[in-house]
Amino acid sequence: MTIAQLAWGLSIVAALFLAGRAWPVKARNGGSIVANASMSWESSDVFTVGTYNIHRARGLDGRKDLARIANVIRDADIVALQEVEGTSLFRPRDQASRLAQRLKRCMHFAPTRKLIFFPQRGNALLSRLPIADWHTVPVFPSTGRAHRSFSVYRMASRHGDVHILNTHLSKPAEGEQPLKAVMQAFARYPRAVLLGDFNATSDDPAMRRHLPEDATDALSDVEPTQRRVDMILLRGLTAEAVWSAPAGPSDHPYFAARLRLDRRPS
């Protein structure tokens, strides 16, 4: 084998390695997102939030059907999504933008990892209410291809800012630092909603250690805490009603809550 052939072979191996590797996405931030906003914070102190790990729209029957996901989330004013499929060479639009177009919502897609320079997968927020600004923070350590992050969305209500946080974390047994970082961010905002898939139940010791003392689990009466890993956590807001939809369109249930702003959060 000549040196040229060896170099060619090594370049092929390197290219295959890079093509198959998932890379984390850097921290990002942005300004207002108002396109398709159909509600105003001036009209009401009550709004509905939801959280849904959509499993790339693959249901328990093995079929991928984004229309089923849209039907589940269509009544939410703000919905946080996890495991959202991004773009690729043969898939020019991510699932979040397709859902936003179907439901006529504001949308932000926060990819958590890239594959061959394409945003392969991530989290997203769809909203009827305008978003004032946003930022996304990667969290470490990550394991394998499961790169993680959380996003913070500031929304300007007539009673002050409301912050919506969305995340998808690995199990605390794989490292508590990501969970700690998310909870520290949550604790900074007096009026905030933390949504997402934590891969841990609310009675997990790590969750108990890092959850702010004044936070409430809006879903505590909806499904036994021993099973549920999807959360709607509140600070400075009150849940007037909560409900869920069973797994089927995804391998996760959908959870939602109707919230009222506390005019003077502590």
Per-range role (PLM):
Residues 1-74, 78, 86, 90, ...:
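Active-site regions of metal-assisted phosphoester/phosphodiester hydrolases
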Residues 94:
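Short, surface-exposed acidic-centric catalytic microdomains
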